[in-house]
């Protein structure tokens, strides 16, 4: 047999010892030296980096060399490096056979004798022969199981490669050169490769006589990592993993061992080939033929499932759960479509672990998977049905139906985080019902300290709800801060007054009192809807004297100002109360019949209010209502308000004669000196109310109409009086009588033009009910009858107008009443200042202030007085500024452009520009003061400043 021929021998001996047993202990290496002290580099030093394999092989070689020297002797220490590496601690028989290999390494024998080089001598080229090309054919390898326990795990990884590389052989190198190369690499031995102390005893070889008996325990030991079905295959797999290369001389001495191994090896070659073919399939699981076929079929069906996957757009519907979704989940019902989709997915889904299912179940699953594309084709049908369900749009409801539907709907208020809580829907509905009831329940109209002396206050108090209770002015105080009357007795509602009528009141109508709801509706009636429709039907008993005041000195306060002044309760509403008012002729007859009725003395003025209970903001408003500047000290404001209130009451008491001179009455009626604060407008309304409540007698000849005033004075009427009521000048005439003396002359001129423009229309309109109601016409007639002559009197031909023919009686719808709010001014009779036409539309004018007393009856008007006095003027200023044409010079923008650019506005310059004729262009006859312009700028949030600063110096920069 040639020297290079090799035979594969399967070894059933145990594995090599562990690496820790083979590697030597870490020896302390000398420290590195540099410079002239550095040791010279050996010629045999390797040029490449040292690897873990080189270190392991070199250390193992050192152990083998030491073992041979101690057991064999110097004559047998010339074995090759390959034999030393593959056959550790061989017997004397093996060492004798290997004698011919001495010439290969004889020249390298001396370097091994050196202690330092003998331990390091091993090259990095020994690892491939150990793993791939060398085969162990001698008996001692199989006889010593503990020697190879650490080697077999490494050889097992390269079992397949060892079979393919057998014919190539291996060219080994001498150990002398390997020792020189390993001298430098031994320094990098890791602590991990330190050998155990029990390694040297295991290197001793043992007898190899009973090699067949050794195979069996080795086979049992390897069954845990080999997957064969027969014991022979176990031998095959276990032995094939250990293939090594030995020389031909060793094979000739071990024929009987090789024969036994060859018989075993020949049987296992067939099994090994079969297993090698089945390796790709056994990588997943150990399966039989039938299971392999079923697995292939499952894979085929699984490929069809992605084709049917377009039916999974339901997964796209999964959206991230938001707080809104969580909040609305309690009100949403589960959709049936989602349930059906989930059930369909569960039925048709085939899990990946169903490889062991029977063929019947797999075929059924394949049928369901094959039927899935059909279901995908039918999937658009449900989408089509959903589209058909979506087009039905809600029917457009009428406003009434829409409001009813909204009132029945539950609204959830709050932020999304609040809505995410798990609240009971029933609790939410109950909460909404309670909120709805609280919003609908308006507060008691009598509970307000102000009876509504002006329509402005009435309209601002539309309904006391949850929002109105917290409404505030711009300066921070409540809109209805004076809801509770702390200085007077508690207010009395109409229902309570009907239940406990005062003894002097003989009105029997209150006995049949209506329910609280009807009285509530009557209370809520404002001046716009009341008019003269509260008159009883013709034929009712004559008007009874008014009831005396309540013990607190107050009359029953209604929302209507005329009822508040009259001082007696109003009868419940009846059907006749809502009929149109009587015609002009019938009204004159009622006025004539009312002129003979006596008047009761009016109650004494109420005591002054306690200003100490007012807040600072309210005190500031009261002071501003009297025309004073802001006072910082609270005590000073209270003292000032007390003096102002006393002066006004004295003026009201002293003006009784003037009021008597301005009103007309029957000859038998005497003036009432106890009337402290009667206003012509309010008194005329009171008289008109009393007259309308009187029965209307049969139509008689025309008589001179008379008007009963609140003062009850007697004044003769002119011979001729127009039957028609003026259209719009009645309110202006009242304001002309009661305007303060300090009124701006521009307003007087506007009122004069207003009277001139309206009087020709009065002459033409002589029949039927005029556009303006009759609440203020009696007062107008009275003021025109006995007012002192003025320039407007000369222009007004109403007193000399001949009486037209008797108008036909016809019913006209009730007109809205635009009352004149109260304001604090100086002298009510000094001069007249009728408001301009725009003031009627804006519900603002300059009414008299003589009757005003700082009580709860007039607090609302006083609070609004700082803003209501100049609202009309502000409207003119706004129109004048906004209607000015834009400038063409960018360097000189218009006033409106300056305001839009937030430029500071010089009040003196803007006032001069407005008075230069700009206000005349917008219909305002007069001039404005810089203070009014400043108020306008502040109301519009316009940046304004004075040209002269507080020190009296003129500003140079703006």
Curated annotation (Swiss-Prot):
Which domain of life does the UniProt lineage start with? Answer: Eukaryota
Q: Which UniProt keywords apply?
A: DNA damage, DNA recombination, DNA repair, Nucleus, Phosphoprotein
Basic residues composition bias: which ranges? 109-121, 374-389
Which compartments does it reside in?
Nucleus
- Can the keyword DNA repair be found in this entry's annotation? yes
Q: Which GO terms describe its cellular component?
A: Slx1-Slx4 complex
Pfam families, A to Z: AT_hook, Slx4
- Compositional bias, Basic and acidic residues, is annotated for 332-341
Q: Where is the composition biased (Low complexity)?
A: 364-373, 655-666, 775-787, 821-838
- Tell me yes or no: is Secreted among this UniProt entry's keywords: no
Composition-biased stretches, type Polar residues, lie in 342-351
InterPro entries linked to this entry: AT_hook_DNA-bd_motif, Slx4_ascomycetes, Structure-sp_endonuc_su_Slx4
Q: How is it modified after translation?
A: Phosphorylated in response to DNA damage.
Q: Where is the composition biased (Pro residues)?
A: 600-610
Region Disordered, as annotated, extends over: 89-123, 183-209, 326-400, 531-589, 594-613, 655-849
The Gene Ontology biological process terms listed for this entry are:
DNA recombination; DNA repair; DNA replication
Q: Name one GO molecular function term.
A: DNA binding
- Share what the entry says about its subunit structure, partners included: Forms a heterodimer with SLX1.
Q: What does this protein do?
A: Regulatory subunit of the SLX1-SLX4 structure-specific endonuclease that resolves DNA secondary structures generated during DNA repair and recombination. Has endonuclease activity towards branched DNA substrates, introducing single-strand cuts in duplex DNA close to junctions with ss-DNA.
Q: Which family does it belong to?
A: Belongs to the SLX4 family.
The UniProt entry, under HAMAP family, shows: Endonuc_su_Slx4 (MF_03110)
What is this protein identified as?
Structure-specific endonuclease subunit SLX4
Q: Which organism is it from?
A: Chaetomium globosum (strain ATCC 6205 / CBS 148.51 / DSM 1962 / NBRC 6347 / NRRL 1970) (Soil fungus)
Lineage at the top is: Eukaryota, Fungi, Dikarya, Ascomycota, Pezizomycotina
Query: Which gene codes for it?
Result: SLX4
């Amino acid at each position: 047999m040639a020297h290079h021929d090799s035979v594969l021998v399967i070894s059933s001996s145990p594995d090599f010892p562990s690496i820790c047993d083979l590697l030597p202990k870490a020896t302390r290496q000398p420290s590195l030296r540099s410079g002239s002290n550095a040791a010279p580099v050996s010629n045999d030093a390797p040029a490449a980096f040292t690897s873990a394999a080189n270190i392991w092989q070199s250390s193992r070689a050192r152990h083998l060399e030491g073992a041979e020297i101690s057991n064999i002797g110097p004559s047998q220490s010339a074995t090759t490096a390959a034999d030393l590496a593959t056959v550790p601690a061989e017997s004397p028989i093996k060492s004798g056979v290997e004698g011919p290999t001495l010439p290969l390494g004889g020249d390298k024998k001396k370097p091994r004798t050196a202690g330092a080089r003998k331990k390091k001598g091993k090259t990095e080229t020994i690892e491939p022969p150990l793993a791939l090309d060398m085969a162990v054919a001698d008996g001692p390898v199989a006889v010593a199981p503990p020697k190879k326990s650490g080697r077999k795990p490494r050889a097992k990884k390269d079992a397949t490669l060892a079979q393919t590389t057998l014919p190539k052989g291996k060219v080994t190198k001498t150990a002398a050169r390997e020792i020189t190369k390993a001298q430098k690499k031994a320094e990098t031995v890791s602590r991990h490769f330190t050998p155990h102390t029990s390694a040297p005893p295991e290197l001793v070889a043992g007898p190899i006589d009973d090699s067949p008996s050794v195979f069996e325990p080795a086979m049992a030991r390897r069954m845990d990592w080999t997957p064969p079905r027969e014991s022979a295959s176990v031998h095959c797999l276990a032995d094939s993993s250990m293939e090594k290369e030995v020389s031909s001389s060793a094979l000739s001495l071990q024929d009987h061992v090789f024969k036994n191994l060859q018989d075993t090896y020949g049987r296992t070659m067939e099994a090994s080939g079969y297993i090698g073919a089945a390796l790709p399939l056994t990588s997943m699981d150990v399966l039989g033929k039938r299971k392999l076929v079923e697995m292939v079929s499952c894979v085929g069906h699984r490929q069809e499932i992605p084709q049917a996957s377009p039916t999974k757009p339901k997964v796209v519907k999964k959206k991230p759960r938001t707080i809104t979704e969580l909040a609305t989940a309690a009100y949403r019902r589960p959709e049936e479509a989602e349930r059906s989709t989930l059930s369909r997915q569960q039925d048709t889904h085939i899990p990946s672990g169903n490889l062991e299912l029977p063929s019947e179940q797999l075929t059924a699953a394949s049928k369901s998977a094959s039927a899935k594309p059909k279901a995908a084709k039918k999937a658009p049908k449900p989408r089509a049905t959903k589209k058909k369900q979506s087009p039905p749009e809600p029917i457009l409801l009428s406003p009434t139906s829409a409001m009813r539907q909204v009132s029945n709907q539950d609204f959830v208020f709050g932020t999304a985080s609040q809505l995410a809580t798990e609240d009971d829907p029933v609790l939410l509905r109950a909460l909404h019902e309670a909120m709805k009831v609280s919003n609908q329940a308006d507060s008691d109209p009598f509970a307000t300290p102000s009876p509504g002396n002006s329509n402005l206050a009435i309209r601002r108090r539309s309904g006391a709800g949850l929002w109105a209770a917290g409404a505030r002015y711009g300066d921070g105080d409540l809109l209805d801060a004076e809801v509770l009357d702390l200085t007077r007795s508690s207010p009395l509602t109409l229902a309570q007054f009907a239940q406990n009528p005062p003894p002097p009141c003989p009105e029997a109508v209150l006995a049949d009192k209506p329910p609280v709801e009807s009285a509530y509706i009557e209370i809520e009636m404002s001046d716009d809807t009341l008019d003269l429709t509260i008159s009883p039907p013709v034929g009712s008993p004559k008007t009874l004297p008014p009831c005396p005041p309540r013990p607190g000195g107050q009359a029953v306060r209604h929302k209507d100002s005329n009822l508040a002044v009259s001082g007696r309760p109003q009868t419940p509403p009846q059907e006749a109360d809502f009929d149109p008012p009587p015609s002009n002729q019938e009204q004159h007859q009622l006025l004539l019949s009312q002129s003979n009725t006596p008047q009761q003395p009016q109650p004494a003025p109420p005591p002054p209010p306690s200003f100490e209970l007012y807040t600072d903001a309210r005190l500031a408003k009261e002071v501003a209502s009297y025309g004073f500047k802001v006072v910082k000290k609270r005590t000073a404001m209270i003292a000032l308000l007390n003096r102002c209130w006393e002066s006004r009451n004295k003026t009201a008491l002293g003006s009784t004669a003037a009021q008597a001179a301005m009103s007309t009455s029957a000859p038998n009626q005497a003036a009432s000196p106890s009337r402290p604060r009667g206003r012509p407008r309010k008194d005329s309304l009171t008289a008109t109310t009393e007259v309308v409540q009187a029965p209307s007698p049969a139509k008689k000849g025309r008589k001179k109409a008379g008007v009963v005033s609140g003062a009850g004075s007697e004044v003769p009427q002119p011979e001729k009086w127009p039957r028609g009521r003026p259209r719009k000048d009645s309110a202006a005439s009242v304001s002309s009588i009661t305007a303060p003396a300090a009124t701006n002359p521009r307003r007087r001129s506007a009122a004069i033009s207003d009277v001139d423009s309206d009087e020709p229309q009065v002459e033409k309109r002589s029949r039927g009910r005029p556009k303006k109601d009759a609440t203020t016409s009696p007062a107008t007639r009275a003021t025109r009858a006995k007012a002192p002559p003025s320039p407007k009197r000369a222009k007004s031909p109403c007193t000399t107008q001949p009486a037209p023919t008797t108008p036909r009686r016809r019913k006209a719808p009730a007109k809205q009443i635009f009352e004149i709010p109260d304001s604090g001014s100086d002298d009510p009779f000094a001069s007249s200042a009728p408001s301009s036409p725009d003031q009627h539309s804006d519900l603002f004018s300059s009414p008299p202030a003589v009757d005003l007393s700082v009580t709860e009856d007039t607090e609302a008007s006083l609070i609004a007085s700082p803003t209501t006095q100049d609202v009309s003027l502000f409207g003119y200023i706004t129109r004048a500024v906004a209607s000015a044409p834009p400038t063409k010079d960018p360097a000189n923008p218009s006033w409106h452009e300056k305001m839009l650019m937030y430029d500071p506005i010089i009040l003196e310059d803007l006032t001069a520009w407005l008075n230069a004729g700009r206000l005349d262009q917008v219909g305002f006859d007069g001039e404005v003061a810089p203070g009014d312009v400043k108020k306008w700028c502040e109301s519009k949030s316009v940046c304004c400043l004075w040209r002269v600063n507080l020190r009296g110096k003129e500003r140079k920069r703006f």
